[in-house]
């Protein structure tokens, strides 16, 4: 009788743990409520004008849609100094407002970013060795404009190596649109475009920026660079999430 009771309790506990895990996965697709924050009222136009006067930006035009982008050299790399705005299937306007695209760019799923079939949101590209090797080419383009490509973790890390270790991304964040203004020391001009879950929830607009890496992380995840008002990190997220894209120039 005692043994049966122990077995019963063990089964119940296992069910509770599994249910909690499933619930946790569901909740991870919802935006957590946050307390209201004091806003930084520095106008976007003032930030942009200051940067245009301070930094030696290059520029190029994407032949696909006529969009023109600023570029900036940081160390030995040349980066787009704006988020990609190219409208493709599997891309979304930040906070679900098309009026945000001009400033914040668009949000893309990982497979859209890499310009590969959507089935790879849930499975590794290793099942197709030709695609697996193609993506790992140094200058694999993906959805980037011609002459640019989706950065790898190594390229993101090379960019971050230029930062003060204690800056927590402040040197990359713009002076506008963040609660805690960045110093934007390199003219990279990161704006908090937020992100989108695959269930349609748009999250953290005005509070967070996330950028894709082309590198896979497990079977259904990929790496991303994330900046908040006080942190910066590279971690894995669901490939079905929609994030911003910054492209780096081919070498």
For the regions a protein language model found, what residue spans apply to each?
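Hydrophobic membrane-insertion alpha-helices, especially the h-region
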Residues: 12-19
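Prokaryotic Sec-type signal peptides and long signal-anchor helices
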Residues: 9-12, 25, 192
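Feature marks short, highly hydrophobic, charge-poor N-terminal signal-anchor/signal peptide-like helices
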Residues: 1-10
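Conserved positions within compact, well-structured domain cores
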Residues: 37-251
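Hydrophobic single-pass membrane-insertion segments
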Residues: 23-32
């Amino acid at each position: 009788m005692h043994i049966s009771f122990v077995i019963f309790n063990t089964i119940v506990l296992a069910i509770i743990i599994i249910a909690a895990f499933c619930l946790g996965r569901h909740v991870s697709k919802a935006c957590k409520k946050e307390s209201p924050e004091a806003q930084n009222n520095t106008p976007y136009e003032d930030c942009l004008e200051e940067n245009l006067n301070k930094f030696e930006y290059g520029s190029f035009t994407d032949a696909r849609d006529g969009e023109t982008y600023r570029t900036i050299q940081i160390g030995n790399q040349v980066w787009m100094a704006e988020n990609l705005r190219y409208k493709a299937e599997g891309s979304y306007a930040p906070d679900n407002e098309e009026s945000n695209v001009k400033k914040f760019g668009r949000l893309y799923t990982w497979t859209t970013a890499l310009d590969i079939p959507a089935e790879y949101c849930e499975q590794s590209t290793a099942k197709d060795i030709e695609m697996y090797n193609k993506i790992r080419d140094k200058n694999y383009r993906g959805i980037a404009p011609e002459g640019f490509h989706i950065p790898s973790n190594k390229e993101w890390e090379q960019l971050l190596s230029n930062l003060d270790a204690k800056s927590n991304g402040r040197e990359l964040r713009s002076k506008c649109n963040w609660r805690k203004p960045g110093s934007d020391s390199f003219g990279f001009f990161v704006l908090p475009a937020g992100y989108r879950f695959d269930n349609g929830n748009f999250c953290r607009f005005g509070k967070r920026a996330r950028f894709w890496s082309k590198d896979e992380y497990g079977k259904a995840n990929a790496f991303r660079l994330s900046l908040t008002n006080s942190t910066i990190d590279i971690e894995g997220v669901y490939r079905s999430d929609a994030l911003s894209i910054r492209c780096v120039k081919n070498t």
